[in-house]
Regions:
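WD40 beta-propeller repeat fold
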Residues: 1-156, 166-189, 195-215, 219-274
Length: 274
């Protein structure tokens, strides 16, 4: 198996080989160059193997590309002239990609147009930074959730990306904090459930099916506080959750990591009567 990562030591993507089951060795095998200039954010990445091992990557709208991992050949290059910074990229299927700008705009593109347009639809107002999570579903009807650094959540129907179908506000302790680790994700096996992290040392689980367009504060079904009780970073205050993901086979199991190096695997229980 191959893994692709983005990050140090430079702007390139690193390709890793995962050894067979009887070994725990992961070795670097190659690198994929990107168009990220010095000082630009690391590329956001997403992968698909539905047609061939492809990686979607880019840090701004005008440098979004799809590269075939083994040959390193570009099969799609954005035709956008905009330098809007990206916060997330995703494959909806082998022919459709979705990107989210840090200001909250969503952009759809057809990978069958090698230099197709990738223009941002109007985004939310305000100076907040946003991230995106794409749920599971039939092509072009997957639910999309966006989370802002101010704690706002917007749910979007991809058939009309310019307007959210529902919105709410997270009950987080420190909205407006750094957006570096913001994350929102859909449960793969629980309809309407999302998880939110990146504000502090907690992960919140929400049920979204009752949300409307009012934007009122939503109460979480469950809050995982395990990281918040970990050791303090040296002179940097309490740990912050840096990433989380849902277990694919266990509906109520999540994995989360924090800035103190802790990694938790945990289950959540819905409130009684829910």
């Amino acid at each position: 198996s191959l893994l692709v990562t983005s990050g140090p030591p430079d702007s390139s993507l690193q390709v890793w080989q995962v050894s067979a089951e009887d070994s725990d060795v992961i070795k670097s095998v190659s690198a994929i160059s990107t168009e990220n200039g010095t000082g630009q954010p690391w590329a956001k990445i997403a992968a698909t193997s539905s047609r061939a091992p492809w990686v979607l990557h880019g840090s701004r709208l005008n440098n979004v590309q799809i590269t075939e991992v083994e040959s390193k050949k570009n099969v799609y290059v954005s035709g956008s002239r905009s330098s809007e910074e990206l916060s997330a990229v995703a494959f909806l299927d082998c022919n459709t990609l979705l990107v989210c700008c840090s200001k909250g705009q969503l952009c759809l593109a057809d990978t069958r147009q090698p230099q197709g347009p990738l223009e941002a639809a109007p985004g939310p107002a305000g100076g907040q930074r946003w991230c995106m999570g794409v749920g599971h579903g039939p092509p072009n009807s997957q639910p999309v959730a966006r989370l802002s650094s101010g704690g706002q959540l917007a749910l979007t129907d991809l058939r009309k990306v310019s307007e959210p179908v529902a919105c709410a506000r997270c009950s987080v302790s420190s909205p407006g904090s750094s957006a570096e680790f913001l994350a929102v994700s859909w449960a793969p096996a629980l309809e309407g459930c999302i998880a939110v992290s990146g504000f502090d040392g907690t992960v919140h689980v929400y049920e979204t099916r009752s949300w409307d367009g009012s934007g009122r504060e939503a109460e979480p079904l469950f809050v995982h506080k395990g990281h918040a009780f970990g050791g303090l970073d040296a002179g940097e205050g309490p740990p912050v959750v840096t990433a989380h993901t849902w277990h694919l086979q266990k509906p109520r199991t999540l994995l989360s990591a924090a800035s103190d190096g802790s990694l938790h695997i945990w289950d959540w229980v819905p409130p009684r009567g829910s």
